Amino acid sequence: MSVMKRVSRRHNFRVLLHEKPFNGVNGSGKHCNWSMGTDKGVNLFSPGKDREDNLRFITFVVNTIMAVYKYNALLKASIASATNAHRLGANEAPPAIISTFLGTQISEILDKFENSSIEDAIEVDDKKGLHLGFGQIPELLLDNTDRNRTSPFAFTGNRFEFRAPGSSVNCGSAMLALNSAVAYQLQQFKKDVEALQAEGKSKEVAIFKVLKAYIKESKPIRFDGNGYSDEWKEEAAKRGLDCQN
């Protein structure tokens, strides 16, 4: 932004970094593409080639959704400003209601995961290890996961895209809030799994039980429809989400 300002002045122009300088005209914002990876370069938001990798994929997707649900106000505060409040909600900007868009594929996978029984979903074999009862997750195509431009926090194939930050801000605040929320949620996930293991559950069964509970609890934050619609504002209020600008 500093470079843009200097260069524009050099050519007798000015850069408008205001989120909504003109009423009725599209405003400006920033999209933060966010993912997580291991020290070996493995993207934790990419489905793997086997069922074990897919369980890892589901684990990190579900915990991210859970973090957005539990710390919704923190994420909203990280992008809040008077000028951004004028931008959010119309003309290609995401709404002020923070929700997650997953797309049909991932939503169906999570619904199936939630509704399956432990016995149906997990088989533990001494030689082969963990098996998931549902088939291998198909290759995720950008076209199938990135259609909803009205979502402020959308899954886009191998990452999440946080679309709410304004054009004049440093994205560090939004990323700090998101990283902190997900990190804290992963710590809680570990505690919940270990608590079930202490009761005698195997690690695989404990992970599955915790994920099922998280999927059910965080459902109010999931929305794949039109974020601009009045129906969504009413539905979001019923779900207990923050609907204020």
Predicted regions and their residues:
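Active-site acidic/histidine clusters and adjacent loop/turn architecture
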Residues: 1
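Acidic/histidine-rich catalytic neighborhood
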Residues: 28-59, 63, 96-100
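Aromatic/hydrophobic pocket-lining residues that form π-stacking "cages" and hydrophobic walls in ligand
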Residues: 4, 64
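Acidic, glycine-enriched catalytic cores built around paired aspartates
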Residues: 7, 21-22, 51, 56, ...
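An acidic- and aromatic-residue-enriched active-site/binding cleft used to recognize and process polar
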Residues: 13, 18-24, 30-31, 37-41, ...
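Structured core elements
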Residues: 14-16, 26, 33-35, 44, ...
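Secondary-structure boundary elements
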Residues: 5-14
